[in-house]
Amino acid sequence: MTLLNKSIRYYVDFDQWGINAFNSNPIETTKGFNEALIYASENNFPIVEVPKGNFIIDSVNTLNQRNPEIGGGIKIPSNMELLLDPEAVFQVNPNGYQGYSCFYIGLAENVIIRGGRIIGDRYQHDYSLIDTDRKTHEWGFGIHVHGSKNVLIENVQISDCIGDNIWIAAHGMMNYPGMVYTPSKSVTVRKCELKRGRRNNLATNGCEGLLVEDCDIEEAGGDTIGPQLGIDLEGYGENGRKYDHPYELTISDCRFRKNGRGSVTAHTSGKVSIKDNYCDNVISYGYSTDVSIKGNKIINEGGSKEYGIDSVGVSSTETGNRIQITDNNIQGFKIGMMIRGKGVSIDNNTVKNASNCAIATHMAEDVSISNNRIQDSDCIQIQVRNSSDIKVSNNKGKGTTSAYAIKVMDSNDVKFLNNTFSNLYGGLYCERSQAVRIKLNDFLLSGKGYGIYWDKDSEVFLTRNEIFEPRNVAIMGAADMYNIRISDNQIYNCKAIIAIHLIGGSEHMVRGNEIMFNRDSDQGYGIYLNGTKKVRLIRNDVQGIGARVLSHPFATFNASSTTLIHNTYDSGTPRLALDDTVIDYK
């Protein structure tokens, strides 16, 4: 070591400062560490080294009865790098207070803490003392960053705190009368191991510029309090006003395992990047804005879990979410992705082994779902519910024994374009939804469901879809409420008795459809109208394969005032109503 290196490093002498390195004398030990750090700071030592030892830390600030975590434990001053030996172990002295801080970085700047191990008192804590305002004992922290900036926490092991193992907080609150808001800024947590935080493993309520990377984050929660997350980005606002707002946050290349209620939640935050992490539980964008969830492996190989990616909606302080969900691999959840809120793009993800639904929207608006792959998921592939302005395009899925590939319920302004689904029970099922456009989709059916179905309260437009081997009606609709358009669709190897069946309503257009039957027996109705009025059938073609004979390629006898123009067929005879108009249909 050079003389220059010696001159900038201060080595803590335990005897000089009355520090006990053998698990005793917590008050004297804590006092000694604080005095040593003050001495090093006042004498301009930028680096302080702590040798190995086992230290009991008095982490409670008893002078602050309301918030004993503020100013508790070892207080690190500005402009200091604290190097802890890998075998330096700091144990919180068991106590009964609502909060504590083993290490406290308050209104400081340019602070680094590296190495060492911090252990909370979770399993020795006295939870019996109940304060009228703070009843849950959830404010005990391993490292507490409070209104500080330019902070690096690296290669530290932290476990078993009664609150969060690392808590990164603002000093004060935004938009609160009489209070000055000082967020923490530019905080990095790197290569740390965080385990068994009773509330969360890491959380922030007010940080501008947070990077958490290459950390192992495990086993948060396990008690009655929440949220029990690996990382909780937990801003707060109500009635259109922000009080806490984490901002410009990146969670990257971390490994999340066995965290009680989820891996990462961006509850009410802004400009968040969650990328390239391994998780075994849910990532949620909550109410947040400008969030990117990219390249994560979200793989559940344990028990039943609800969501791979989840959400809540739009915050009262915002007009939308603006979310990007791309390139993720999601496996083993009931629902792969649950999309809520406004302004969400879901692109190029893989969802595997979903059991209830692969991708779902609920109370969502302005959503694009595109280029996703759904594998080994015997369930609804894509569901749109209580949503509007939804586009679903270029997705691919297969393999349902009792579920439709797509379900639409109580929604409007929904477009399905160029999706491919195979080996299906049924294609698309629509209820109580309007302005549903279904175009250029492929449905290869193997079950007894409909190819495309809608109820009497739905408005649909079907264009250029291909339906293969339907065993039930290929296109079926109870069209009472709206005028329906069915054009240029192709139905191949239809094994059902009816290919297109319309019930009720008036002035529908059925144009340019190609229907190919391939039944094991005679009979078959190409287009069957029941209770409709003034429907136009134009240039549709109905064909039977082999020697089987169709009954009636066009059956309008239970309808009225149908107009048939230039329709063609190769077997059977049309069965028409007396008031139909026919123009060269063969």
Curated annotation (Swiss-Prot):
Instruction: Provide the residue intervals of the PbH1 repeats.
Output: 108-147, 148-170, 184-206, 207-235, 246-268, 288-313, 320-341, 364-384, 387-410, 411-432, 435-456, 481-504, 505-531
UniProt keywords, alphabetically: Repeat
| Alphabetized InterPro entries for the sequence | Beta_helix (IPR039448), PbH1 (IPR006626), Pectin_lyas_fold (IPR012334), Pectin_lyase_fold/virulence (IPR011050), SCF-Subunits/Alg-Epimerases (IPR051550)
Which SMART domains does the record cross-reference, listed alphabetically?
PbH1 (SM00710)
Matches recorded under Pfam families = Beta_helix (PF13229)
Write down what this protein is called. Answer: SPbeta prophage-derived uncharacterized protein YorA
What species is this protein from? Bacillus subtilis (strain 168)
The record lists the lineage as:
Bacteria, Bacillati, Bacillota, Bacilli, Bacillales
From the UniProt record, report the name of the gene that encodes this protein. Answer: yorA
